[in-house]
Amino acid sequence: MKPFQKDKIKILAFDIDGTLFSSENIILDTYIESIQKFIKSSGRELLIPSKEKIIKQVGLPVKQIFRNLLPELNEEERDSISDNVLVLLCEKIYEKKGTLYSGVEDCIKELFDRKYILCIASNGRAGYINAILDSYKLLSYFKELVVIDYSSIQSKGDILKSYLTKFNMTGENALMIGDRKSDWEAANYGGSPFAFCEYGHAEPKEIDSFSLKLTAIHDLLAFL
């Protein structure tokens, strides 16, 4: 893992789920509602995944989530459920359901004032990310959003590298901030240091190396 060098950091690349926001208290009902809607409209018999199985998928690319949860369906069928999940999640986020972690708003504003380039590097879709940032009035602090398009951008690592290219910087100039293995992998792929959010959704022993460890998002302010 790349060592953290404070004076080299220009870009802060944030994951969303388990880093800035937790959808844990709305994910289960939303997924179940969407799967039940599909069952009713299609007449298919499906075993609804358990809460534990659903929560374990948080932070993975969307298509991978639904392949893991509903392998018996084809991609078009999974996408129809996934699209309904997105609509319902965005509605709930704008109703201020879900949880923005304590200190996020002040931390983001302070880092913006310190002239860091703030970016999002998430496996989530644009609508979901924008709903979170917009509903908490944080959207204006972040640069243009890059998301997985399953073409030129296929992973979180590709997202991070696209920001490095866009701002003409190298890996050591970006700090990847997140809670899951995909965030660790993105940092490693981009040659960047990794700030591990231990308060997020990581499984025990999922993250075994990091450049920094955060017990809360505002810990970043002390490191930077």
Language-model segments: residues:
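Acidic, Mg2+-coordinating phosphoryl-transfer loop and its flanking beta/alpha structural elements
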Residues: 175-213
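Conserved phosphate-coupling serine/threonine residues in phosphotransfer and NTP-handling enzymes
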Residues: 122-124
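Short, acidic loop-to-helix structural element flanking the phosphoryl-transfer center
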Residues: 91-120, 130, 157
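N-terminal helical cap/lid subdomain that shapes the substrate entry/recognition surface
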Residues: 7-102
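Short acidic capping loops at alpha-helix termini that bridge into adjacent secondary structure
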Residues: 50, 77, 140-144, 171-175
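A short, structured active-site edge motif that brings together acidic residues
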Residues: 54, 139-154
